């Protein structure tokens, strides 16, 4: 967005927090940020306000703006169908229009009096229907003949702290059985040292050829890999759009998990399973996310090529379902609101 000329009033990194307990140390800062943003927008009201995801931050802001006559659009519906049922009433008060990225959401929202439009998922248009593994490997410098396992332990410090040690110990287990495996790990510059420390703690010395880190190359790594071990979140959808069999894992502080599981409305956590409405890929959550179990599940995909091919076909169907002209559909919906106002 910055590259397109948008002005950043605060760096995105200050909003990069997920969970319940994890947000507490940042709560005062986040609330102050939202108050300052509301004051600024109310002092100079925009023609329309679009909140992008982040419902815990954006919905109260949208309510305040809408009460002052500012038309509001919310892009990416809260996951009320998974564990945010309580958000529907606030969403009704907050948004003149919700732009949904999943096809089943508009009907559910409209049944609760929330205007909603399906616009497709932006990632489905960004990612090629037939990813080129050979080209990705050439770009990353990975051998075309090796079996590559992608490790994606998350994009936040808390996720890395909880998952990277488990993922690298799982990699160590896998190497014990398949010494020729190679592991590709996308990371961000700000998280590289933390990821490297987790790798070293699992016994991977700096420069170990079995593990390679790639900064800002998550899509390249997913295109290049044979199978992925992925932290629950948007990265699981990305892996599905790249048609890669995967194992989903997540671990969070005990209290956050207790709160979340009491709100959980479906048996699945990973987006591919939620969208397919069945366990098409295995999930290992909390104490089930043990390194040996993760390793066994990843190797199982490599040992079952027919099952891997079947799940890739499911992911191809999913890709077509989510692939729409999102930018045009979203802009059309916003234009209608502007004309109406």
PLM features: what roles do these ranges have?
Residues 1-341:
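Nucleotide-activated sugar donor-binding and catalytic core shared by glycosyltransferases
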